[in-house]
């Protein structure tokens, strides 16, 4: 009689643990969309990032870009979606020197990949911070083509 009771108790505890884990999920939803996983070098690669609550309310957030190779961050850049696509600072990634603030949606048509990154498996990471709710990393696998 003790074994069925113990099995039922363990099953109930496991279900409670899973339910508790599900409610402890990230307090906001963030998505990253891009046109392709194989962008062309030295050409515009537009991206869109959205941030909202689970109920659909738009949230104010900040974003930075990180470039990851073999699990290690090799470069950090700051979004500047309003910069001229052909400007020197946009090509060098130095138009901004701080995280880019936005509400709900960030559309950046100015992301470009250098020719030296062609053929290398990289991850494009957008680090999203929402004040009071935490940070999320949005990773997107990329292999640049010439």
Model-derived segments and spans:
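Bacterial N-terminal signal peptides
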Residues: 8-17
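Short beta-strand segments of immunoglobulin-like
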Residues: 33-39
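Structural beta-strand segments of beta-rich domains
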Residues: 43-47
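Short flexible loop/turn segments that cap and initiate beta-strands
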Residues: 52-80, 122
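Solvent-exposed serine/threonine-rich low-complexity stretches and specific carbohydrate-binding patches
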Residues: 73-104, 141
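Short glycine/proline/serine/threonine-rich loop/turn segments at secondary-structure transition edges
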Residues: 110-123
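Enriched for extracellular/lumenal, surface-exposed ectodomains of secreted and cell-surface proteins
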Residues: 123-134
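Short beta-strand elements
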Residues: 132-146
